[in-house]
């Protein structure tokens, strides 16, 4: 898979041209699917549904943005809820409201991280409409945010926000399987907001992921980056680990990289044999609480967007009268 990602999707390998006919077929299928679901299957709701998604395969930094939007909504005095698919969640009955003492293996790493960082209900369900209805019935929320779900067209939405990785952009620009696009780049013209994570693009808003103090997993004690004067192990099980490694480099931390697949369920043996202090992402850290030790740390990040985005966001017609 890494060959496709690095050489074909984000490079100029000849194999992409062999796969282009399949990409055109894929475009026809997804266009037809979208038309059908929107016309015949989409469920609409009486409150704003904000979808934060992406048009590429892999991680782009959606979850920190979801957390920041939820916090901003709460600051307006509004009740917000979050729905998520719960990717790789072991639980089998849905919809399910994430509890703070749940394990990442049970409910998924991103839903658990969001539930622990925001004082609002987080509900998982592969069929997102079930999660939306649960929030409306059980919590009387005023605004719902969907973490991912841009292509889940059975769920109605009021605002669509697409996040793009500023390092990798849209790759070679082709749809699957020749490229990383879930939908053609023309889809960007139809959404309400395009946000570039750690970069810039014409007509898009820029987002920065600001690193906070490093935290020791076992005690939740904040530790200065200056404490790490010797080499550490940088562990990442995210869609684009290079972004995490670049952040550590910018902080002046020397490290050996240990990359795992996105959403990897860490076990003690993954980390026990590493003789160095381990710094991981916050998303990975929620999977390691049950076997935390003094050598495990994580680096939280916070999404930061400029005032122009928030002015445009709160001026959106779908949010009028909600604050």
Swiss-Prot record:
It is an enzyme of class 2 (transferase). It catalyses: a lipid A disaccharide + ATP = a lipid IVA + ADP + H(+). Its EC number is 2.7.1.130. One of its GO terms (molecular function) is tetraacyldisaccharide 4'-kinase activity. The keyword Lipid biosynthesis applies. ATP binds at residues 56-63. Pathway: Glycolipid biosynthesis; lipid IV(A) biosynthesis; lipid IV(A) from (3R)-3-hydroxytetradecanoyl-[acyl-carrier-protein] and UDP-N-acetyl-alpha-D-glucosamine: step 6/6. GO terms for biological process: lipid A biosynthetic process; lipopolysaccharide core region biosynthetic process. The keyword Protein biosynthesis does not apply. It comes from the Bacteria. Keywords: ATP-binding, Kinase, Lipid A biosynthesis, Lipid biosynthesis, Lipid metabolism, Nucleotide-binding, Transferase. GO terms for cellular component: plasma membrane. NCBIfam families: lpxK (TIGR00682). Belongs to the LpxK family. Transfers the gamma-phosphate of ATP to the 4'-position of a tetraacyldisaccharide 1-phosphate intermediate (termed DS-1-P) to form tetraacyldisaccharide 1,4'-bis-phosphate (lipid IVA). This is Tetraacyldisaccharide 4'-kinase.
């Amino acid at each position: 898979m890494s060959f496709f990602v690095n050489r074909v999707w984000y490079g100029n390998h000849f194999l992409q041209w062999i796969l282009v006919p399949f990409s055109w077929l894929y475009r026809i299928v997804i266009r037809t699917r979208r038309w059908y679901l929107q016309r015949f299957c989409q469920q609409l709701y009486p409150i704003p549904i904000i979808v934060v998604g992406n048009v590429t395969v892999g991680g782009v930094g959606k979850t920190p943005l979801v957390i920041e939007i939820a916090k901003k909504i709460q600051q307006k005095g509004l009740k917000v809820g979050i729905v998520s698919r719960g990717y790789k969640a072991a639980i089998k009955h849905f919809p399910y409201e994430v509890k703070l003492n749940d394990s990442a293996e049970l409910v998924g790493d991103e839903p658990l991280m969001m539930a622990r960082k925001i004082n609002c209900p987080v509900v998982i369900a592969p069929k997102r409409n079930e999660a939306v209805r649960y929030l409306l019935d059980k919590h009387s929320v005023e605004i719902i945010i969907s973490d991912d779900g841009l292509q889940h067209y059975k769920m109605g939405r009021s605002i669509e926000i697409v996040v793009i990785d500023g390092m990798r952009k849209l790759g070679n620009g082709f749809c699957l399987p020749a490229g990383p696009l879930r939908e053609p780049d023309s889809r960007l013209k139809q959404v309400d907001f395009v946000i570039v994570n750690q970069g810039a693009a014409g007509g898009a808003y820029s987002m920065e992921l600001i690193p906070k103090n490093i935290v020791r997993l076992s005690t939740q004690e904040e530790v200065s980056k200056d404490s790490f004067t010797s080499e550490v192990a940088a562990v990442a099980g995210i869609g684009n680990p290079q972004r995490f490694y670049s952040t550590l480099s910018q902080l002046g931390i020397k490290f050996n990289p240990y990359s795992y697949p996105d959403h990897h369920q860490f076990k003690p043996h993954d980390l026990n044999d590493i003789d160095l202090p381990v710094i991981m992402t916050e998303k990975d850290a929620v999977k390691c609480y049950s076997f935390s030790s003094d050598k495990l740390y994580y680096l939280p990040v916070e999404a930061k967007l400029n005032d122009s985005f928030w002015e445009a966001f709160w001026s959106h017609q779908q949010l009028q009268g909600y604050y």
